[in-house]
Every structure is written in structure tokens, then in C-alpha cells.
Amino acid sequence: MSDGFGRPPPPAPAGHPTGAAGGDPVRVMVVDDSAVIRGLLTRALEGDTEIRVVASVGDGQMAVNALQRNSLDVIVLDIEMPVMDGLTAIPKLLAVAPQVKIIMASTLTLRGADISMRCLSAGAADYIPKPTSTREIGGADAFKRELVSKVKALGAAARRAGSRTRGELRPLNPVPAAFLKREPPPVTLRPAPAVGSVGQVKPDVIAIGSSTGGPQALFEVLAHLKTGVTQPILITQHMPATFTTILAEHITRQCGMNAQEAKDGEPVVPGRCYIAPGDFHMLVTQRAGANVISLTKDPPENFCRPAVDPMMRSILRAFGGRKVLACILTGMGQDGLKGCTEVVNAGGTLIAQDEASSVVWGMPGAVAQAGICSAVLPLKEIGPYIRKFASRAA
């Protein structure tokens, strides 16, 4: 089975912490109105010894009640349920436990993609394309591996943020003093990354790569770029087909930008935002002296299609390294490291999101720790940085 991204499921990243913080299992709640689906998801998750399903409930209201009683790291949340649906439940869940990570389980339909995007805007951390039948869930190894990988990565992120949810602190009955003294496992932050040089030439193109947590990060960054930035913006966000169409629509509505899912052969023009469509690599090639979009079904890179690395390499060839401003936002894995290294070596400029503001510091962490970034910034500073850099004198 495909995992929804046109790629085989990724293996666990090298050096990734076990469990959520190298110790206790990731604590998960499964929320779905189908008892059969809940059972299948629970078995898939508990097939990994570093995950423990501590609650399994049938609607959003039950999830809120369960979260008040349980300490959780990750919630796998269905979208359409009786009593309280997933979209309605998200703000209520985050009000109880602001740092808990929520993964939406969504069907690969336009309606499912649109609601998933609204859920991400409301605070969900990620989504997973849900198979359409219980038979597919029960027998789909790719789906199980993707689910487990995301739960473990987001569980680790929750603990690194110091957010192991303390639902037990909320009951009306007195809490034993011994319980109150318990602390979450210690978290060791990585040392500050080395910072490289800043390009001296006004860029002709802006290229952005993102994955887990990317839609929310893109909305934040692009909201600062709707005026004052004339360069074309090319974005590869790891997403399946259908979802990328909806992502472009949401960027247009929320950020006031001219965003669209890229089409093969269309020219790359100033002031437009191009989104790589799901299951295609988005490249820039030159035809008759003009830069145009080229969509390919070349093999996945870094287990991804679309992938950031081929986009970066093609932009480097089309525009020249010194004319490229690249940015890597939150995401799992190391996609973008090789392509961005080539951009920087050719004189381009690279910035990345910092660990504290990333949902998962995999992709930005890889380029930051490689020492090739001109700046490693909190999410709220990235949009203003890009705008200032892009509007500098030539």
C-alpha cells in the first residue's frame, strides 16, 4: 500500500530517540467512533514497545474527558464523529493540555483534505491519510509504519517541549503529595548550531521545504510576504495528492497570496507562490530562455515524492546559486540537506527554523547542525527575515 505520499514508508531516523525521550513509552489516546478502527489502530501502535495506548474513546467529548484524567503525549483523532467531531474537539483538547500533539486521521478526499487543513490551522500537529476500509488498516504495513513513526516523533517533540501532559493534576479529589513531586524526564537540548555566511546578492527566487507541522509554519511565514516580496516562491511540503490542492487554496485565503498547485510547463513568474503537487517532484527547468515548472515521477528521494532536494537542485541550475534564498521549516527526516548544501556552496543563502518553535526538528535540524545556515530563527522571525532579505537593494 502507498502511504499517501507516493513513497515507501521511511525507516526510523538514525539517532532518533527511543520512546519519547529515551525512556518511558509514548502515551497515546486513540479517538474514533468505530470500535473496530480503534482496536486496529491500538494493535498497530502497541506493536511497538515504545508506544503505550492509555485511552481509547469514541468521540471528541469523551476524548476531552479522558485527557483530563490521563497524562498523554499524542492523540490520534478521527475527524467525523458523533457528539463532538475532531475539528470541534481540537481547541478543547489543547485548552486542557496545550502541548499535547494531535494527529488527524483523514481520508484522501477533497472534503477530508479541507477539514484536515482546518484542523492543522486550529492546532493539530500532523495528519495521516486513513485507509478507506478496516481490511486496509489491518493489513497495510506501510500505514502502520507511518503511524508509528509519526507518533514516536511527535511524542519526542512533546517531551522536549517539557509538555508531558499532567491530566491527573486536574481532578476534584485531593492529589497525593508524592504524585505532585513527580517530574517529567529530563530533556537535553542540543548545542546552538554553527552559522554560515549571508549572501550579498538580492535573490531572484525563494524556495521553501517543510514536512511535519509545515502547513501551520507556512501560514505564519507567508502572511508576512503578501506585500513587499516580488520573487516567485516555490514550496515543497510533504503531502499526498488532494491535500496539496487544498493547501494552496488555504494559503491564498489565509495569507492573501497568489498561491496555486504547480502545473507542468507553466512559467515561473514573479509574485506567485507554487506548491509541489502530491506524488510529483516539482522542478524548475529552462525552456526557450524562460524558467518553467517541470513535474516528474522520478523515484522518491529521502523516501518522499515530492521531495525538497530535487527542487533545490533544479532551482540552483535554473537561477544560479547566488540568486537563491532557501528556507527549511519544521519536518521529520533530512530532506533538503543535500540540495541546500549545493545551494550554499554555490553562493546562495539558507535559513532554518529553530528547534524550540519546530513541531519536529528533523529537516531544519539537519541543515542547522551542518553549519550551512545564515540564520536559525524562531518561526515568528522567519517571515520578516525573508521579506527584509528579499527586498534589499540588488
From Swiss-Prot:
An example Gene Ontology biological process: chemotaxis
Modification after translation, per record: Phosphorylated by CheA. Phosphorylation of the N-terminal regulatory domain activates the methylesterase activity.
PROSITE patterns xref list: CHEB, RESPONSE_REGULATORY
Name of the top EC class for this enzyme: hydrolase
CheB-type methylesterase domain location: 191-393
Entries under InterPro entries matching the protein: CheB-like, CheB_C, CheY-like_superfamily, Sig_transdc_resp-reg_Me-estase, Sig_transdc_resp-reg_receiver
Active site: S211, H238, D335
GO cellular component: cytoplasm
EC number(s) recorded for this UniProt protein: 3.1.1.61, 3.5.1.44
CDD domains hit by this protein: CheB_Rec, REC_CheB-like
Protein name: Protein-glutamate methylesterase/protein-glutamine glutaminase
Origin species: Azospirillum brasilense
